[in-house]
């Protein structure tokens, strides 16, 4: 019997939670990962290697999907100290991906090589073969370029789009990305930052078109917390409305919403300063937009913060897959 094909789309902070749990299931996994990051280590590497697709999100996804021993993982994720000169703040894995990207001719090729080396469960694809610049247009008409600058701009985001950083052309999807979406049984969007992790992938025209054409079940994992500079005062219905608006029509089949209350002591603004308050529920608004709304306890409290429980999310996704068979 053919294994179900599940493709997860997003960034390197949110989707590893899902990918780690999917590895335990009898499914074929693919991850499509944003390449619009221009902050931190990825941003510094982009300044010095203009052809480089930012490696940070890809690094985290690689670790989540690999069978590397814990020591290898620590080495790959090791971040140089602030007194390390030119290497300060860079994770070793980012430097390895950057070096292999140059050696192999592209980040796509580098990720395929690293996936074999670390025995990943599934395929990892950058959403584009070129570094992208994320642009946010705010409701007052002002525009900000660069993912790392968007959250600091006051006001509400109206929409976002991406350009090829190298020449401002309309970006193309990376190899096999469109085919992977069209051949999937399920597409999972998120969890992760709405405007800076999920949308930078799906506003690539070829990817957006594939999402509208695929016969796969499309599930969106709604965020638990609102995010500073992105989704302040958003309900869960608002998140879905933004996704649909960016592709021009409704395309999500299922939304998964956490209804477990986050204890006040886990709303740690000192440690997680980008997260504000728990997302409010608007089930009437969701039901107008989505055929299936699954609300349950998907909460995991860990390290002083509130996160999605990957096992609970994936168990629900597997139930949906079984119903579709």
Where in the sequence are the language-model features?
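Non-transmembrane, aqueous-exposed alpha-helical and coiled segments at domain scale
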Residues: 1-6, 20-23, 28-31, 119, ...
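Gly/lys/ser-thr-rich phosphate-binding loops in alpha/beta enzymes
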Residues: 1-55
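Short glycine/serine/threonine-rich phosphate/pyrophosphate-binding segments
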Residues: 14-19, 196-203
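A short helix->loop->beta-strand "cap" motif at the edges of active sites that frequently abuts
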Residues: 27, 214-218, 290-291
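Electropositive, gly/pro-rich neighborhoods at or near active sites that engage anionic ligands
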Residues: 36-156, 316, 323
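Active-site gating loop/helix substructures
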Residues: 130-195
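Charged helix-capping and loop-helix junction motifs
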Residues: 201-208, 234-239
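C-terminal functional extensions of proteins
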Residues: 233-325
């Amino acid at each position: 019997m053919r294994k179900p094909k599940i493709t997860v789309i997003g960034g390197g902070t949110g989707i590893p939670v899902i990918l780690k749990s999917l590895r335990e299931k009898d499914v074929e996994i693919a991850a499509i990962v944003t390449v619009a990051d221009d902050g931190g280590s990825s941003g510094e590497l982009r300044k010095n290697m203009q052809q480089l697709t930012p490696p940070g999100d890809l690094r985290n996804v690689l670790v989540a999907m690999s069978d590397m021993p814990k020591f290898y993982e620590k080495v790959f994720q090791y971040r140089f100290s602030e007194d390390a000169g030119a290497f300060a703040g860079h994770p070793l894995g980012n430097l390895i991906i950057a070096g292999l990207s140059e050696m192999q001719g592209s980040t796509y090729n580098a990720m395929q090589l690293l996936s074999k080396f670390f025995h990943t469960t599934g395929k990892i694809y950058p959403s584009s073969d070129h570094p992208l610049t994320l642009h946010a247009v705010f409701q007052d008409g002002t525009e900000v370029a660069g993912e790392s600058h968007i959250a600091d701009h006051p006001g509400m985001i109206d929409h976002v789009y991406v350009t090829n950083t190298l020449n401002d052309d309309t970006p193309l999807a990376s190899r096999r990305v469109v085919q992977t979406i069209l051949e999937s049984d399920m597409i999972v969007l998120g969890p992760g930052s709405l405007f800076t992790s999920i949308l930078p992938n799906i506003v690539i025209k070829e990817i957006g078109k594939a999402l509208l054409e695929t016969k796969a079940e499309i599930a969106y994992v709604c965020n638990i917390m609102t995010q500073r500079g992105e989704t302040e005062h958003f309900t869960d219905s608002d998140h879905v409305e933004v996704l649909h608006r960016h592709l021009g029509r409704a395309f999500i089949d299922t939304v998964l919403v956490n209804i477990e209350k986050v204890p006040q002591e886990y709303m740690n603004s000192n440690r997680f300063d980008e997260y504000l308050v728990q997302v409010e529920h608007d089930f009437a608004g969701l039901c107008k937009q989505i055929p299936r709304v699954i609300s349950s306890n998907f909460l995991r409290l860990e390290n002083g913060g509130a996160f999605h429980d990957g096992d609970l999310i994936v168990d629900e996704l597997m139930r949906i897959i079984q119903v579709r068979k």
